[in-house]
Regions:
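Internal catalytic-core helix/loop-beta-alpha segment
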Residues: 80-123
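Active-site environment of divalent metal-dependent phosphoester hydrolases
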Residues: 10-15, 38-41, 60-66, 99-104, ...
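Helix-adjacent hinge/juxtasegments
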Residues: 50-98
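Binuclear metal-dependent phosphoesterase catalytic core
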Residues: 79-88, 108, 128-157
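Active-site neighborhood of phospho(di)ester-bond hydrolases with catalytic His/Asp-centered motifs
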Residues: 6-7, 30-36, 53-59, 93-96, ...
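N-terminal active-site segment of His-dependent metallophosphoesterases
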Residues: 1-48, 62-64, 68-69, 73-76, ...
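Short acidic, glycine/proline-enriched helix-loop-strand junctions
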Residues: 43-54, 128-134
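Acidic, histidine-bearing metal-coordination/catalytic regions of metal-dependent phosphoesterases
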Residues: 1-2, 53, 152-157
């Protein structure tokens, strides 16, 4: 199962649209957004996804009721972090601001921790058998770095 991961889109609609097109082209079965969508009009772009989406609020998501209503109307969901998502037998803990993703994984029992907030890409393994994974997809919006980024998680590998 392929899971698309994005974060910190910050209302940059052209780059959110590009991410949606990428996730659809890759055949993602689920998309996770790790916060800072910002406005309800921005979440509407996720309507073009060919799969369900799950999201958490970020520190800049002020209009929470509007975001929640819009996500629900599109068949997705957005909730206060952290949330746990099950994908093909893999447990994924999703939050926005994560001080120590390894501690989050250990305390929650998650296989994967997805987070955002820093706008910096992180893909790191932890544990003796390297079976615990931390993923920060960077920033989909590209406002701080000038680079738009997302991540893919293949649950089979």
């Amino acid at each position: 199962m392929l899971v698309g991961i994005m974060s910190d889109s910050h209302d940059n609609l052209p780059l959110v649209k590009r991410a949606v097109e990428f996730f659809n082209a890759e055949g993602c079965a689920l998309v996770i957004h790790a916060g800072d969508i910002i406005s309800p009009f921005s979440i509407a772009v996720l309507n073009k996804l060919a799969c369900p989406f799950r999201a958490v609020y970020g520190n800049n998501d002020g209009e929470k009721v509007g975001l929640k209503l819009k996500a629900a109307a599109l068949g997705g969901s957005i909730d206060n972090p952290p949330i746990m998502v099950e994908a093909d037998g893999i447990t994924i803990r999703v939050l926005h601001d994560c001080g120590d993703w390894r501690a989050e994984a250990r305390s929650s029992g998650a296989d994967v921790v997805v987070f955002g907030h820093t706008h910096q890409v992180v893909v790191e393994y932890d544990g003796e058998d390297r079976k615990i994974l931390g993923i920060n997809p960077g920033e989909t919006g590209g406002w701080l770095s000038g680079v738009s980024s997302v991540a893919l998680l293949d649950t089979a590998s």
